[in-house]
Amino acid sequence: RTPRQHVGGCLGHSFDHQRGYHPDPFYGGVMDVFRQPKYAYYMFKAQRSPEKQDRLFETGPMVYIAHEMTPFSPKDVTVYSNCDEVRLTYNKGGKTWTYTKPATKEGMPSPVITFKDIYDFMIDKNMSMRKKKQDEVFLLAEGIIDGKVVATHEVRPARRPEKVLLWVDNENTDLKADGSDFVTVV
């Protein structure tokens, strides 16, 4: 809970970058040096209103699982969402947990959601290697408002690489073919 004396806070720079005056890079941004969102980006995004707005930036309901599903990942699963409820499912036909946002408006508008003791890498390994059911191993978060699923996010463990997936990150802005434009390929 934030004390009554707290006036506000700020984030000095949103992107990781080379400082210029010091050899150590600045790693405190909500996006990395390639402008790819880090977990902090989604935590801040969850503080937005879930109402859709006609704006230049993303609006509306969101849910994001901040978990990598690796042998080194914690058992606790962290989820960021601005929805009233979040339902988390671990594996196909597996157990489901539900978080309901408290009615009181103290502190952050959308607190960080932690589902305790959910993930077990050995279950993942057993299903994938022994039972050959790697397609059934996942974490699925569903954001629910007024009893309806309005946002979803699914995370699957990384396997051996099969392909390279690239896309143009143009922020829905068309390129100009006069040679003066460039685009980031992610």
Label for each model-derived stretch:
Residues 1-149, 166:
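Extended substrate-binding grooves/exosites of carbohydrate-active enzymes
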Residues 14-17, 181, 185-186:
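Exposed regions on extracellular, virion, or secretory-pathway luminal proteins
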Residues 67-73, 172-184:
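Short, solvent-exposed loop/linker segments at the N-terminal edge
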Residues 147-160, 167:
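Edge beta-strands of extracellular beta-sandwich domains
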